[in-house]
Structures are given as structure tokens and as C-alpha cells.
Swiss-Prot record:
Gene3D superfamilies: 1.10.287.1490, 6.10.250.1590, Kinesin motor domain. Residues 862-967 are annotated as: Globular. Pfam families: Kinesin (PF00225). ATP binds at residues 85-92. This is Kinesin heavy chain. Composed of three structural domains: a large globular N-terminal domain which is responsible for the motor activity of kinesin (it hydrolyzes ATP and binds microtubule), a central alpha-helical coiled coil domain that mediates the heavy chain dimerization; and a small globular C-terminal domain which interacts with other proteins (such as the kinesin light chains), vesicles and membranous organelles. One of its GO terms (cellular component) is microtubule. The keyword Coiled coil applies. GO terms for molecular function: ATP binding; microtubule binding; microtubule motor activity. Kinesin is a microtubule-associated force-producing protein that may play a role in organelle transport. One of its GO terms (biological process) is microtubule-based movement.
Length: 967
């Protein structure tokens, strides 16, 4: 390929299958493939060099798109392969694939293996030097993936105005395994992120450069070829990817650089524009030779077939269609020998001599025209014959060499020195800029780390402040609680002191009353003794009265028999009337008292019975609702079963329709075969052409009608299935809602049952209280009977006293004064007894009240003591929690400081390790070398796998003292 040749950019369209997310979302496959090199979307057809369907293998993609470039690169030409498309369209899968599975390898690992296999089959007199570089364009900055300290590399141009990345790390390799190790190393340093459309979305454009230099050891002919393998980041629509924060900034830069790439391709495809905006982004600067320059370029446009991404897919196809019109001029990159330069110099010198002679003729002809002379056609200079045609192989470099050779030796030496000096100054300035940028990046990283540490410290400090404020608030609230508890305790103590004082006062009063009671009791005893004496005397009088009454009755009987009067029955009748009145009064008081208590108990019992009836009614209603809910659930389950059967019937119908479609397709195939047979016969019978075409149109219309009916039936079945599914979902929702209602009703039922149990317990307690009241009533009744008996005894004594006094009045009038004195003494004794009874009753009431107050205080005292203990425990727990929080904060602070120190030490050690790169030695490899030979023996292996008899050829191996390479 000594002569430059034009060629278009080769564009291959690859369509990936629908992914799981698109299938779940219901996206449809909208792309169609009319032929192997065309694709259509929404009725518009795009033609490319090759269209790859979703089911093609990685090996087929490589064989179609990348394998032909290997021979061109090893023949001294430049090559470029890059993937373009929206995010999640399969670009990284196409370029890299799955490195762990050989069957899923992408273009990069396969082309690396193929390059070495091609080298092993070439002439053994050829010696190769292979260098690789791997960098990414992240946030419009070139970042070295093999040395992450180089974060802002610059793009320069060499003497032939070819752009290159200055300062990028170059690794010399001699086997595919070494290349794969470098790829793994760079891939681990590449920026990736998670978006809504892709779990491993590339956030940068990666460029993998393979620089192959070869030299024929016999003819000293040197060729060089560069292979750019570019994995572009996908264009993103933020509304779909959900990018935010740093990911959003990355998306902006990605879309900006891809927009610049689109502008370059549009300008190159137009052909009329004089300016191509290569300098709008670093991506287009690096790909300048690949787009409209000296390179054989293959572009793989990756498309998504989903209807969800229809607009992005159209944009990608239009991009590929424009890129297909770009023409590159491919020429061999050859370093000429001295003889070749000399031959070209002589050729150019001869050409310049002819040009000078032609110029002299033209000047003479022009002079004649200016003087007004006419120049005949035969005498006019023919430029087509006289001007020698420029050789297509003549490059601007050779022309410049010829012009420099035409200068004198001094000017040429001075120009060469100035050029070298300028290049040296440019290199020094680039080194200085690179060092400054690296220093700036390091300082930025340190500042970012410090800012992160400060932000983390601020967040920790804010969290600690919040914890401290929360703990202080808890402490304040605890203090308030303690104060309230202490105040309550003080009030309780004061109340307790007051109650104690009151109890002491009451006890003193009780003691005083007890003393008074004792005195009253002693007085009562004395009175009782006197009463006993009176009883004895009354008994004595009673006997006497009895005797006298017997005698009197006898006398009265005798008198009654004689007279027949009722005077003797008057007093007993009056006495019995007084007794009945007193007993009625006592019974009436007791009955009125018990009546009020019984009324209250009856009303309380009625309320409880009403509440119980209401509860029973609620339970019955809830049981009815529960049974209704169970019935509804059974009905819905039956409906669900019927709907499932309907769905199964729909599926069967769908299968039957699919079988019908298959049968129709078979009939269509048969009809098509018959049609072909008819077409074969048409060549012999031209008269039947119209009839056959009409038959064909009728058949096509019938097939179209069948297809439309089938589509309608399928659509109706899908709609019916979706409706059934919606109905099933609604029934499931209703079932779940009814289940929740059932659970709620069951909970309410359990709650009512619990309330019923509690009320039954309360009713039992009330019944027990009623029984106790009945028992107390019986006891009180017995007491009343005893009191009634005592009153009856006193009444009898009073009657006896009255009778005795009457008898004494009758017997002796002389003893009237004495009887009057006795009657006055008895009245005084009765008054004294009633006074003592009243005092005793008051003392009993006071004693009972004191006992009740003491019992209430004793009941309140344990509650207050329990509350005091709970408050003290709460205070102790808050104090321990505060202490634990302080200790935890101290531990977290120490651990955080230790972690920061450890990270700083690790970063420092890592920086030291990065600075300690050892010197690299380029390892030339020879064709015929076996793949399994170790790199240490690679320099001495020749064709056939045998070792060279002259030992390893180290003379051609350049020694590099640093990992960077300069242009």
C-alpha cells in the first residue's frame, strides 16, 4: 500500500435483545430487518455495511467488524474501532464483553489475540515492538487508567500534525496474557455508576491504543500502525436515567462530548464546510485521524429495539447513516531509508526543474500578452502537458524535505536547531504543565479528602451536638420530673405529717374519749349495780305484786263474777298498745334504711343487666357480620375459581387460534409455492399473466384479511385476558380487604368477649357485695331483735314500777312523798342512761371515722412509696444512659481519629509505592514465536519456535527509564 487510497467509514449496526426491565414494562420490539444490510424503524429504512440481529454471537460480531483491520494495522496502516449508542445499548459488551468467559469475549480481547496469532504466522525476518496505552476521558479530562496520578493529560500534535496524548503511560507487551492483565488493571480504575437504565453504566469514554512497530532486519524497512479501540459512554436522557448529583455532572459532560462528535461527523458528511470543529472536545481531537484522516475506521452503532427508546434509536441510526458517508485517506506509515529519501529527492528535484521551465514559458507568454502581441494557439503553453502531475505517494513530509534540501546548508542547520529547540521548549513546558496539573490534582484530592474529613467531622459534631442536646433535654426533663416528684414527695410528706398530726390528735382525742368512756363505763357499772339492786328490789316488789295481783285477781274474779266488769283489762291493753307502737317505730326506721339500699342495688343491677343485654346484641350483630363476611369470601373464592377457568378457556382459545394461524401460514406457504409454479409457467403463457396476477392479489388480500382477523382476535383475547386479570386483581383486593375486615371484627369480638368477662367478674363482685349486705342485714336484724328485747325488758320494768307505785298509792297515802322521790330518782336515772348511750354512739362513730382515715392513709402510702422508687430508678437510668452516651461518643471519636490516621498512612504508602516504578524494557517479539514462551525468552525466539543460535537480540531493545513516553 505505497499509494494512498480512499475508503468510507465502515458502519455496522448491532441490535441487542430486549432486557428484563423493558419486558416487564411492556415495551415492544419495533425494529425490522428487510435485508442483511438494512434496518427499518417506523417505516424508514437505513442501510449500513452490515446489520447484526440480536441473536448473533460475539465471535460473529468480531469476524464481521474487526478482524479485517488486523492485517491493515500489521501492514503499517492506522485503524480505529469504536462503539456508539445510547446508554444501556450494549457498547461495553460489544467492545469488552465478559473477560472471564472466552465465548463472551468482545472485540478488544479477541483482536489482541488475533494480532499475536497474525504476528506468529508472518515472516521471521520481521521484528515487532508493541506498546499499549489505556486512558479515559472523564469530565472532559484525559485520565490515565494505568497511572491514576495522571488526571489531566494534554493532547499535542507531532511534526506531521497528528494528535497524540502527551504523557500517557505506555506498556511494552509480548503476549496476549500481558495485554489482558493491563486491560484488567485499567478496567478496575474506570469510572462506572448505577442508573435507572443500567447497573454498570460507563461514565467516561475509554481509549485503548495499540501501537505496533515492525522492522525488517534484512531490508531495514520500518512500518508502524496504531489501533484505537474506543468504548464511548452512552448518550443519556436524564428523565430516564434518573441522574442526580455527580452522576448528573458526568451525564452533562458525556452528552457535550458526544454532541461535539456529532458536529464533526456532520461537518465531514456535508463536504462543503471548510472548517471541521475537531477542537471542540478532547474526544474529537484524539479521533481526528480516525474521522476523515489517515485511518481505516469501523463504527459499531448499538441500538435498543424497545419502543420505550424509539427516539434514541432513530437518532443513533441517523448518526450512523451520516458517518457512513465520511471518506478517510488510508496510507502506509513508513519510515523511509536513506536511498528511498535520495530517490524521492531526485524525483522532486527533476519535477521542480520542469516546473521552473514551465514557469519561464508562462512568464514569456504573459509578457507577450502584456505588450499587446497576439500569441497563437500553437505557441500557447499547454499546462496539462508541461506541468508534471504530482505523485499520489508524495506526501507533505517529502515535499517539505525537498524544500529544506533546496536551502543552503547553514539555513537548514539553523532551522533544524530552532525546530529542535522549540520542540525542547514545548516538551519542557508540557512537562511543567503536566507536573503542575498533577500537583494541582494531588492538592485537589488532598483538599477533597480534607473537606470530606471536615464534613464528616462536622456531621459527627452535629450528630454529637444533637445527641448532647437530646440528652440534655432528656436530662432537663428528668430533672423536671425529679423536681415534680420531689415536690410531690414534699407535699406527700407534708400531708403525711399533717395526717400524722391529725392521727396523733385523733389518738389523743380517742384516748381522752376512751378515758371519758372508761369513766362513763365505770359510772355505767355503778349505775348497773344500782340497776341490779333496783332489779332485785323490783323482783322482790314483783313477787309481792304478784302475790298481791293473785290475791287481787282472785278478788277481781270474785268481783267480776259478781259485777261482770272489764276494768281490770284496761291497762294491759294500753300497755300492749304502747309496745306495738314502739316496735313499729323501730321496724319502720330499719325498713326505710334498708329500702334505700335495696333501691340503689336494684338500679345498679338493672344497669348491669341492660349493659349485658347490649353486649349480647353487639356480639350477635358481629357474629352476623362475621358470617356474612365468610359468605362473601366464599363467593369471591368461587368467582376467582370461575375466572381462573375462564382464563384457562381463553388460553385454550389462544392456542387454538395460534394453531389456526400456523395452519394458515402453511396454506400460505403452499399457495406461495403454487404461485411460484404459476410464475414459472407464465414465461410460456403470457396470456395468463393478468389472471395469475389477479389470483395473486386475491390471495394476498385474503392472507392480509386473515392476518388482520388473527391480529384482531389476538388483540381481543389479550384485552379479555387483561380484563380478567384486572378482575382477578380486584377480587384479590376485595378478598384481602374482607380478610382485614374479618380480622378487625374478630378483634372486636374478642374485645367484647373480654369486656363481657370483665363485666361478669364485676357482676360477681356486686353479687358478693349484695350477699355481704344481706349477711350484714341479717346481723343487724339480730342486733335489732336483741335491742327490742332489751327495750321490752325496760318497758316491763317501767310497767312494774308504775304498778308498784299505784299499789303503794292505794295502800298508803302517807307514803306519797317517798314514792314521789323514788319516781324522781328513776326519771333522773333514765335521763342519765340516755345521755350515756348518746355519748357512746358518738364515740363509736368517731372511732370508726378514725379507723377509716387510718386505713386510707395506709393504702395511699405504698402507692406513693412505689412512685418514689420508680422516679428514683428513672433518674438512675437517665444518669447511666448519659454516662454511656458520653463514653460511646469518646470511643467513636477515638475510633474515627484512628481510622483517619490509618487512611492517611495508607494513602501515603500508596503514593510512595506509585513513585517507586521500576524501569521498563521493551520486548520485541518475532513471528513464528510460540505463545507459551515466557517473556524472558521472547527476544531471542525466531520462526518455528526454535532459539536463535546467536543468542537474544538485545541491541534493538530500547531501555525506558520511566513509564511515560514522549513524542
Amino acid at each position: 500500500m505505497d499509494v494512498a487510497s480512499e475508503c468510507n467509514i465502515k458502519v455496522i449496526c448491532r441490535v441487542r435483545p430486549l432486557n428484563e426491565a423493558e419486558e416487564r414494562a411492556g415495551s415492544k420490539f419495533i425494529l425490522k430487518f428487510p435485508t442483511d444490510d438494512s434496518i427499518s424503524i417506523a417505516g424508514k429504512v437505513f442501510v449500513f455495511d452490515k446489520v447484526l440481529k440480536p441473536n448473533v454471537s460475539q465471535e460473529y460480531v468480531y469476524n464481521v467488524g474487526a478482524k479485517p483491520i488486523v492485517a491493515d494495522v500489521l501492514s503499517g496502516c492506522n485503524g480505529t474501532i469504536f462503539a456508539y449508542g445510547q446508554t444501556s445499548s450494549g457498547k461495553t459488551h460489544t467492545m469488552e464483553g465478559v473477560l472471564d468467559k472466552p465465548s463472551m469475549h468482545g472485540i478488544i480481547p479477541r483482536i489482541v489475540q488475533d494480532i499475536f496469532n497474525y504476528i506468529y504466522g508472518m515472516d521471521e525476518n520481521l521484528e515487532f515492538h508493541i506498546k499499549i496505552s489505556y486512558y479515559e476521558i472523564y469530565l472532559d479530562k484525559i485520565r490515565d487508567l494505568l497511572d491514576v496520578t495522571k488526571t489531566n493529560l494534554a493532547v499535542h500534535e507531532d511534526k506531521n500534525r497528528v494528535p497524540f496524548v502527551k504523557g500517557a503511560t505506555e506498556r511494552f507487551v509480548s503476549s496476549p496474557e500481558e495485554v489482558m492483565e493491563v486491560i484488567d488493571e485499567g478496567k478496575n480504575n474506570r469510572h462506572v455508576a448505577v442508573t435507572n437504565m443500567n447497573e454498570h453504566s460507563s461514565r467516561s469514554h475509554s481509549v485503548f491504543l495499540i501501537n505496533v512497530k515492525q522492522e525488517n532486519v534484512e531490508t531495514q524497512k520500518k512500518l508502524s500502525g496504531k489501533l484505537y479501540l474506543v468504548d464511548l459512554a452512552g448518550s443519556e436522557k436524564v428523565s430516564k436515567t434518573g441522574a442526580e448529583g455527580a452522576v448528573l455532572d458526568e451525564a452533562k459532560n458525556i452528552n457535550k462530548s458526544l454532541s461535539a462528535l456529532g458536529n464533526v461527523i456532520s461537518a465531514l458528511a456535508d463536504g462543503n464546510k471548510s472548517h471541521v470543529p475537531y477542537r471542540d472536545s478532547k474526544l474529537t481531537r484524539i479521533l481526528q485521524e480516525s474521522l476523515g484522516g489517515n485511518a481505516r475506521t469501523t463504527m459499531v452503532i448499538c441500538c435498543s429495539p424497545a419502543s420505550y427508546n424509539e427516539s434514541e434509536t432513530k437518532s443513533t441510526l441517523l448518526f450512523g447513516q451520516r458517518a457512513k458517508t465520511i471518506k478517510n485517506v488510508v496510507s502506509v506509515n513508513e519510515e523511509l531509508t536513506a536511498d528511498e529519501w535520495k530517490r524521492r529527492y531526485e524525483k522532486e528535484k527533476e519535477r521542480v526543474t520542469k516546473l521552473k521551465a514551465t514557469m519561464a514559458k508562462l512568464e514569456a507568454e504573459l509578457q507577450r500578452w502584456r505588450t499587446g502581441q497576439a500569441v497563437s494557439v500553437e505557441e500557447q503553453v499547454d499546462l496539462k502537458e508541461d506541468v508534471p502531475a504530482e505523485s499520489p505517494a508524495t506526501s507533505t513530509t517529502s515535499l517539505a524535505g525537498g524544500l529544506i534540501a533546496s536551502m543552503n546548508e547553514g539555513d537548514r542547520t539553523q532551522l533544524e536547531e530552532e525546530r529542535l529547540k522549540l520542540y525542547q521548549q514545548l516538551d519542557d513546558k508540557d512537562d511543567e504543565i503536566n507536573n503542575q496539573s498533577q500537583l494541582i490534582e494531588k492538592l485537589k484530592e488532598q483538599m477533597m479528602e480534607q473537606e470530606d474529613l471536615i464534613a464528616q467531622s462536622r456531621r459527627d459534631y452535629e450528630n454529637l451536638q444533637q445527641d448532647m442536646s437530646r440528652i440534655q433535654a432528656d436530662n432537663e426533663s428528668a430533672k423536671d420530673e425529679v423536681k415534680e416528684v420531689l415536690q410531690a414527695l414534699e407535699e406527700l410528706a407534708m400531708n403525711y405529717d399533717q395526717k400524722s398530726q391529725e392521727v396523733e390528735d385523733k389518738n389523743k382525742e380517742n384516748e381522752n374519749l376512751s378515758e371519758e368512756l372508761n369513766q362513763k363505763l365505770s359510772t355505767l357499772n355503778s349505775l348497773q349495780n344500782e340497776l341490779d339492786q333496783l332489779k332485785d328490789s323490783s323482783m322482790h316488789h314483783r313477787k309481792r305484786v304478784t302475790d298481791m295481783m293473785i290475791n287481787l285477781l282472785k278478788d277481781l274474779g270474785d268481783i267480776g263474777t259478781i259485777v261482770g266488769g272489764n276494768a281490770a283489762e284496761t291497762k294491759p291493753t294500753a300497755g300492749s298498745g304502747e309496745k306495738i307502737e314502739e316496735e313499729f317505730t323501730v321496724a319502720r326506721l330499719y325498713i326505710s334504711k334498708m329500702k334505700s339500699e335495696v333501691k340503689t342495688l336494684v338500679s345498679r343491677n338493672n344497669q348491669l343487666e341492660n349493659t349485658q343485654q347490649d353486649n349480647f346484641k353487639k356480639i350477635e350483630t358481629h357474629e352476623k357480620d362475621l358470617s356474612n363476611c365468610k359468605l362473601l369470601i366464599q363467593q369471591h373464592e368461587a368467582k376467582m375459581a370461575s375466572l381462573q377457568e375462564a382464563i384457562k378457556d381463553s388460553e385454550n382459545k389462544k392456542r387454538m387460534l395460534e394453531d389456526n394461524v400456523d395452519s394458515l401460514n402453511e396454506e400460505y406457504a403452499k399457495l406461495k409455492a403454487q404461485e411460484q409454479m404459476h410464475l414459472a409457467a407464465l414465461s410460456e403463457r403470457e396470456k395468463e399473466t393478468s389472471q395469475a396476477s389477479e389470483t395473486r392479489e386475491v390471495l394476498e388480500k385474503q392472507m392480509e384479511m386473515h392476518r388482520e382477523q388473527h391480529q384482531k382476535q389476538l388483540q381481543s383475547l389479550r384485552d379479555e385476558i387483561s380484563e380478567k386479570q384486572a378482575t382477578v386483581d380486584n377480587l384479590k383486593d376485595d378478598n384481602q380487604r374482607l380478610s382485614l375486615a374479618l380480622e378487625k371484627l374478630q378483634a372486636d369480638y374478642d374485645k367484647l368477649k373480654q369486656e363481657e368477662v370483665e363485666k361478669a367478674a364485676k357482676l360477681a363482685d356486686l353479687s358478693l357485695q349484695i350477699d355481704r349486705r344481706e349477711q350484714a342485714k341479717q346481723d343487724l336484724k339480730g342486733l335489732e331483735e336483741t335491742v327490742a328485747k332489751e327495750l321490752q325488758t325496760l318497758h316491763n320494768l317501767r310497767k312494774l314500777f308504775v304498778q308498784d307505785l299505784q299499789n303503794k298509792v292505794k295502800k298508803s297515802c302517807s307514803k306519797t312523798e317517798e314514792e314521789d322521790e323514788d319516781t324522781g330518782g328513776n326519771a333522773a336515772q333514765k335521763q342519765k342512761i340516755s345521755f350515756l348511750e348518746n355519748n357512746l354512739e358518738q364515740l363509736t362513730k368517731v372511732h370508726k371515722q378514725l379507723v377509716r382515715d387510718n386505713a386510707d392513709l395506709r393504702c395511699e402510702l405504698p402507692k406513693l412509696e412505689k412512685r418514689l422508687r420508680a422516679t428514683m430508678e428513672r433518674v438512675k437510668s437517665l444518669e447511666s444512659a448519659l454516662k454511656d452516651a458520653k463514653e460511646g461518643a469518646m470511643r467513636d471519636r477515638k475510633r474515627y481519629q484512628h481510622e483517619v490516621d490509618r487512611i492517611k498512612e495508607a494513602v501515603r504508602q500508596k503514593n510512595l509505592a506509585r513513585r517507586g516504578h521500576a524501569a521498563q524494557i521493551a520486548k520485541p517479539i518475532r513471528p513464528g514465536q510460540h505463545q507459551s514462551v515466557s517473556p524472558a525468552q521472547a527476544a531471542a525466539i525466531r520462526g518455528g519456535g526454535g532459539l536463535s543460535q546467536n543468542g537474544p537480540m538485545i541491541t534493538s531493545t530500547p531501555i525506558r527509564m520511566a513509564p511515560e513516553s514522549k513524542a
